[in-house]
Amino acid sequence: MLREEIQRLKNREECVWKQRSPNAWLKEGDSNSWFFHCRANQRNHINFITGLEDNDGVWREDEGRMGGIIKNYFKEIYTASNSSGFEEILSGVHSAISEEDAGLLDRDFQASEVRLALDQMIPLTAPGPDGMSPIFYKSFWHIVGRDVTSMALNALNSGVVPESLNSTFIALIPKVKHPKKVADFHPIRLCNVVYKLISKVLVDRLKKFLASAIPETQSAFLSGRLISDNVLVAFETLHYLKRKTNGKVDQMALKLDMSKVYDRVEWEFLEQAIRHLGLGERMVSLIMSCISTVFYSVLLNGQPVGNIKPSRGLRQGDPLSPYLFLMCAMGLQSLLNKAEMEGHIRGVAICRNGPKVSLLFFADDNVLFCSAKEAECQKILDILAIYERGSGQKINQEKTNIFFSTNTPHKVQVRIQQVLGVPSIRQFEKFLGLSALVGRAKKQSFIFIKERVWKNLQGWKEKLLSQAGREVLIKSVIQAIPTYTMCCFKLLKGLVRELESMIRNFWWGYSGEHRKTHWVKWERLCEAKEVGGLGFKEIEKFIDALLAKQVWRMINNIDSLCHRVFKARFFPNCSISDAKESSSGSYTWKSIIGARDVIRKGMVWRIGTGEAVRIKEDRWLPGRANCSVISPLPPMAPDVKVSSLIDPNRVAWRTEVVQQLFLPHEADIILGSPLSTRRPDDRIIWAHTPSGTFTSCSAYKMLVSCDISTSASGSNPDSQKKFWKGIWQLRVPNKIRHFVWRMCNNALPTLVNLHRRNIVPSPTCGQCHNYPEDSPCGMVL
């Protein structure tokens, strides 16, 4: 009993320090309270505000004066301006939500929606004024659930959110090493959990209808869209501009950066934008209540300061805010569409029959494409001025930049930069979080990934972690750093080897310039835990799996802007499955087409009419390892379709033909496959998920399993899995499980292993002096 009580108190203490650190990546690992102490202490030291400059440049260290400076700063930001011109901005935004859908949105909210919203919330997030994290409500839902649900439903169904639920803290996190002004801090909004529940329920209902209402030029936050779609289009267009060395029309790309996009949204403009989309009165009132009943207090060294009542702005941290911002951004889309229709602005098409692209949204970033003419640039400035007056948005000139096509004369470039007041992009500058251009010096283009990984690995705090903690850090943080880049670009093999070398050194321990002994091969560490590895990702295979997702999306989303742009340029007369790599293609395209074999290995056709599927060439036999036909078929044209095996009148297989052409076991598989009487189109599905939908995770597992199957030994894999699962399920601290894992992999510094590496002169046991010390048990004793 005493031991259980000590363990309970120890777990409670560790939980407290975990929440104070905080480290979202360390979901499991060793119990390492010293690590969390150091993280929390360092965090407090960094976030502590010793003084601030006021508007006159005078340094103030008195907390009362600092509180006044902070309060005045946020009051100015959250005070509405004299916005105008709503109708001009929103004239092109038409009702995209039908009356029937608006009625569905306005129906009463149910208790099940509240519970679903809670289940979707991350358990340990920073608490708001209520002092609670979602984990409290999840743990004690059987006690507080009824009251919380009643409170949330009352607000949702009445359309009035009480101010007591909508109070919000603003925490200030330094953006620079030595902050002096309030602007040098990043404000983090901390909402009450009950308000987040209300907001999340509202979002879950809204987002089902917004995908059809928001234009395809916006690829963030919406179901069925990925931000990488627009990233691919943008970089393909930039590649076209770079290669455009002649032609009468000079062209350019303008990346717009909006300053404090959420904070400056005018509520009156937002309300008009929502109404133009066709939302019902009840939904409009509820949304406006969510954003207008808020009031802020700023945390100054842990103490709330001020009581700020805003008259404009959205909160980062509110689940509703990203979707409301998308609705506002439709105003800019409307103005640009009108200018394009009137011929004032001309978009960029990367080939003769390709779609013209004039605007792409990336959440709160935008990229405009137009001709490099002073008149068009002046029109863009006029549009932005109108949009700023109505929406409250403001262009950040310092972070806005231009990229010109190669054929644009230098004089024209200089003049346009003067008109717009922004610089042009150089070779390796960042663009949308990635290198603006990927040319011959590819390694230099992606060097920032190596620098970020190195910076994370060199953090002194991570040296406090055991190998169990370092495992989780590698998986959750280090190997996740390049994911955004790897979704669009294939990293060079040399860079991949360098990244893996850095990760290996960190895993085994690295002090200064001397690395510790690597007792197990990297390939072994990358194997799944159930077969004796640690489940680290092989970066090259993971890149292929991520890029394969782009191929899959192009196969299944043929109406998307991304597919239409790439099809027009690279495979106008066929599908991406039959496309050829172009020598003049961008590095983006070469990266994507290089991952096509991953899809070919894992895809299978689901037969509808059979008119799109070739008997000999395609994978269409269910229940087989490779889904391909192996029967020795008689000579036939390679493009003979599966439809020739189907009787269209009966919607059934031609039994005699099938039995005559195929081996008995394949004929049985074909005849046992049902055909739909609705005769749907043939469809490609992914064979490695139950739903038939592609996931990068399943593709990676498929690639790894292919290697394992080709190198598998004669040992019993089931018994191996049982053995290793037993180790990882031991009810002991994670560092002990890792020690057992090292014993089983002969990865401990026994004298035999040290002698094999010429570290000690003799492998003989120092206790008995008779036998080699190769038994881990001897070390334990």
PLM features: what roles do these ranges have?
Residues 1-3:
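Short, charged, amphipathic alpha-helical segments
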Residues 5-8, 15-27, 31-781:
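A helix-boundary/hinge signal
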